[in-house]
């Protein structure tokens, strides 16, 4: 179909074949040069998107538009006489336009984008339906197609066969379900209703594929136990051993006791009763018994075959030597039309070189031609496919192959039928053909099957040589032909050879003059005696070509067999292959080990990094929590600070303004040194308990406040003494109002006035000296002794007063002690600000630090 041509070799009135394959056509114009008598139109391998302008081809019987870009198929709706429609490998998404095609018998829609299959129900005459390699998820209703014989659904996404009994026609004989998504082997039970099913394919489904978790099992006997009339499964003829196992599973075993959903239980059972055996030594005792029974049966069948062959030799020789004496040369086409076809033979003819597809052609032969060519000597089973090819390729990957032939040659259309790989030649009306085929199938299972095939092929070649030489010699001696007739016949032969069918259909035995000598038997060629002399050189050349083809086929067979035998039975080769596998395995293990080590190292590094980050985050979180708790505590204490206490400065490093800016004397310098020492001592005591965090809550910040309080305490005592001695009462004035703003103003005025008072400066120096002594005593002694010492120091601190003022001083001190005892809450607040224990510091028990009295 690769070259565009118009086949006009048919008889007038029978129509013609128009082939426009590979012409780069994108559309079918209105001026389509298609005559009314065209019965076959081939448009393969173009760029056609839409079928249009086909209405004038009303007599069209066969249409092929494969490998194009069709999206819809409504263009075929008006071709009511169509019998063969070939539309594979397009982009058709829906089946349409088939309502009026009541004569359609052969439909191929493989390799499209179909999702349903119910739209073909209107084609009730359909016999062959190919819907492979689509997107069909479930079996559709095609029960109205009562004439359907072949249904191809491989390469889809079918998951269940539950609707098969209701949706599939009963007369179906060929069913392909390979390469789908059937996961339960028990689904095969739904095919038991197809009583005429002979060929089935279930391969490359998940339910029959080997998995590491499931032991190996042979599913073929189980399928045969449900489909009792099955002859071919997954492209291989069912052997008698498998039939016996299937019968045992059906009658005595548990083959039919499992239901859909029990796939695992079924597989485990089949692994025990039908295990996979790769060598003869692994066969069980039951298999050995079956093999013994079958070997005896094959022996008797071979004896019967040899007897039947001897009986047929004599009538075959008589037919071959019979010569039809006709007064003039007649064409093969005329003789064929005169002879009525009496037999139809379905045979394998080969593999297409372009599409790699298997197909069979239905041929019509006269009775004499059938008796001569298709004798039992020529019937034998050959399998040139190696085991590796069977494992690596799908036996049903082939699709329906369209081959146009003349409509007048066969009363039944379509003329192309699909058969699964491995089917042998079958004679439909011969009772002994089935027995012979079974004998040959069993013969292939023998240990010496190769020798028998070689002997049979050699005998066929020798017989062919003898027949050709006998016919040529007899024709040369008995039927001379004029020279002019020989030349004209030779020219006519060459002319018809140029217009013959494609090479892929060369063995289809079509009745064109080009391949009539190749397809017809020597007995058929005896009808044309005047053509024998013209064909003698061509016959000799064909013999050489045939011998070369046979030698090439034999070489290929021998190479395949030697390779298979070496790989499986040669110990040295098996050892080398085993070493290679071990080496590859070791290298793979080393590579995986390195990868695991690298991943483990990365994991450890990541773990260490994660641990460090977690520790850092945990440490920071603890710090934040401690700071937040400390800040909350400080804020609570500041909130509970009494309103009569002046605000405290938060900066220790801020310079303290001098108390005596105008009058500097040695006593003021010494007072400044004592103040600095007291500040440093207070900072040293508070540093271990409260680190500097930036908040205004350090204990050392209270030193100015304490100093002011002590200053005011001393001033009040001095003022009382001055009032007793007659000094001026205007020096110190107690302020009773404790308002915070008035206190701050009065404190600043008092500071300015006290800086100008030399007497107040002397009193402050004496007070600081007493405070320093109290601090030293507190560090050296326990709390009780320190408290006693503090009282004695406070009692005897003013040494410059005379005896008359001592009594007054003791009275003032006792008054101050009473005031201190009346304000324990203020002492408690000061101690909480410093972070000390609940009891007050004994060094400050004699001081009134909670009450601030500012002089005016």
UniProtKB/Swiss-Prot annotation:
The modification Phosphoserine is found at residues 308, 410, 497, 521, 755. Residues 776-787 have a biased composition (Acidic residues). Residues 550-579 form the IQ domain. Residues 737-752, 799-811 have a biased composition (Basic and acidic residues). GO terms for biological process: cell projection organization; negative regulation of cilium assembly; regulation of mitotic spindle assembly. The keyword GTP-binding does not apply. Acts as a key negative regulator of ciliogenesis in collaboration with CCP110 by capping the mother centriole thereby preventing cilia formation. Required for recruitment of CCP110 to the centrosome. This is Centrosomal protein of 97 kDa. It comes from Mus musculus.
């Amino acid at each position: 179909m690769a070259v565009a041509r118009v086949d006009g070799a048919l008889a007038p009135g029978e129509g013609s074949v128009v082939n426009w394959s590979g012409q780069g056509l994108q559309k079918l114009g209105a001026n389509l040069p298609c005559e009314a008598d065209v019965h076959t139109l081939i448009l393969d391998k173009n760029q056609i998107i839409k079928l249009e302008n086909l209405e004038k081809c009303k007599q069209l019987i066969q249409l092929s538009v494969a490998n194009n870009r069709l999206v819809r198929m409504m263009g075929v709706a008006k071709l009511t006489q169509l019998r063969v429609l070939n539309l594979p490998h397009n982009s058709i998404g829906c089946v349409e336009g088939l309502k009026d095609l009541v004569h359609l018998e052969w439909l191929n829609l493989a390799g499209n984008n179909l999702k349903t299959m119910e739209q073909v129900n209107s084609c009730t005459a359909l016999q062959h339906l190919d819907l492979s390699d689509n997107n069909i998820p479930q079996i559709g209703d095609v029960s109205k197609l009562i004439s359907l014989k072949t249904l191809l659904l491989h390469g889809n996404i079918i998951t269940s066969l539950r609707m098969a009994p209701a949706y599939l026609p009963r007369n179906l004989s060929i069913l392909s379900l390979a390469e789908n998504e059937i996961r339960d082997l028990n689904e095969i039970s739904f095919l038991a209703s197809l009583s005429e099913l002979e060929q089935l394919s279930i391969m490359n489904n998940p339910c029959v594929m080997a998995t590491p978790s499931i032991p190996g099992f042979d599913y073929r006997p189980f399928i045969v136990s449900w489909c009792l009339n099955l002859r071919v499964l997954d492209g291989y003829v069912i052997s008698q051993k498998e039939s016996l196992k299937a019968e045992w599973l059906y009658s005595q075993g548990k083959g039919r006791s499992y239901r859909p959903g029990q796939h695992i239980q079924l597989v485990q059972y089949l692994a025990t009763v039908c295990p996979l055996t790769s060598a003869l030594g692994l066969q069980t005792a039951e298999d050995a018994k079956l093999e013994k029974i079958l070997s005896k049966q094959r022996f008797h069948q071979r004896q019967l075959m040899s007897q039947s062959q001897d009986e047929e030799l004599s009538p075959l020789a008589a037919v071959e030597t019979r010569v039809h004496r006709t007064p003039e040369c007649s064409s093969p086409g005329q003789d064929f039309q005169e002879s009525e076809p009496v037999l139809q033979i379905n045979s394998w003819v080969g593999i297409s070189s372009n599409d790699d597809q298997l197909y069979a052609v239905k041929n019509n032969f006269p009775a004499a031609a059938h008796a001569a060519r298709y004798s039992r000597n020529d019937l034998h089973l050959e399998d040139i496919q190696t085991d590796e090819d069977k494992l690596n390729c799908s036996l049903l990957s082939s699709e329906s192959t369209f081959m146009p032939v003349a409509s007048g040659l066969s009363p039944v259309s379509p003329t192309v039928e699909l058969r699964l790989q491995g089917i042998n030649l079958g004679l439909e009306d011969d009772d002994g053909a089935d027995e012979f085929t079974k004998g040959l199938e069993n013969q292939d299972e023998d240990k010496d099957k190769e020798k028998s095939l070689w002997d049979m092929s050699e005998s066929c070649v020798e017989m062919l040589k003898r027949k050709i030489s006998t016919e040529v010699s007899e024709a040369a001696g008995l039927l001379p032909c004029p020279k002019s007739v020989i030349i004209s016949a030779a020219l006519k032969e060459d002319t018809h050879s140029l217009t013959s069918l494609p090479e892929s259909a060369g063995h289809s035995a079509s009745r064109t003059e080009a391949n009539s000598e190749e397809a017809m038997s020597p007995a058929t060629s005896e009808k044309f005696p005047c053509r024998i002399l013209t064909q003698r050189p061509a016959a000799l050349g064909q013999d050489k070509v045939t011998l070369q083809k046979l030698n090439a086929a034999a070489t290929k067979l021998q190479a395949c067999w030697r390779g298979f035998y070496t790989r499986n039975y040669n110990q040295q080769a098996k050892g080398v292959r085993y070493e290679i596998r071990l080496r590859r395995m070791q290298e793979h293990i080393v590579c995986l080990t390195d990868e695991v080590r690298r991943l483990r190292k990365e994991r450890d590094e990541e773990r260490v990094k994660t641990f460090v980050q977690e520790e850092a985050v945990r440490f920071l979180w603890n710090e934040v929590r401690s700071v937040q708790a400390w800040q909350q505590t400080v804020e609570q204490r500041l909130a509970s600070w009494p309103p009569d206490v002046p605000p405290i400065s938060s900066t220790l490093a801020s310079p303290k303004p001098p108390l005596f800016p105008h009058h500097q004397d040695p006593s003021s310098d010494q007072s400044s040194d004592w103040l600095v020492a007291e500040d440093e001592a207070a900072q040293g005591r508070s540093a271990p308990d409260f680190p500097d965090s930036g908040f205004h809550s350090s204990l050392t910040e209270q030193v100015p406040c304490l100093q002011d309080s002590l200053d005011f305490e001393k001033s009040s005592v001095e003022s009382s003494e001055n009032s007793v001695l007659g000094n001026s009462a205007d020096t110190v004035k107690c302020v009773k109002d404790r308002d915070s703003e008035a206190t701050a103003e009065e404190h600043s005025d008092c500071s300015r006035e006290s800086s100008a008072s030399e007497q107040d400066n002397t009193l402050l120096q004496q007070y600081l000296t007493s405070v320093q002594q109290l601090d030293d005593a507190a560090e050296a002694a326990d709390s009780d002794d320190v408290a006693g010492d503090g009282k004695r120091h406070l009692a005897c601190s003013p040494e410059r007063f005379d005896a008359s003022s001592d009594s007054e001083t003791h009275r003032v001190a006792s008054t101050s002690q009473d005031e201190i005892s009346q304000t324990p809450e203020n002492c408690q607040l000061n101690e909480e600000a410093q972070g000390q224990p609940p009891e007050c510091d004994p060094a400050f028990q004699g001081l009134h630090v909670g009450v601030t009295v500012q002089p005016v």
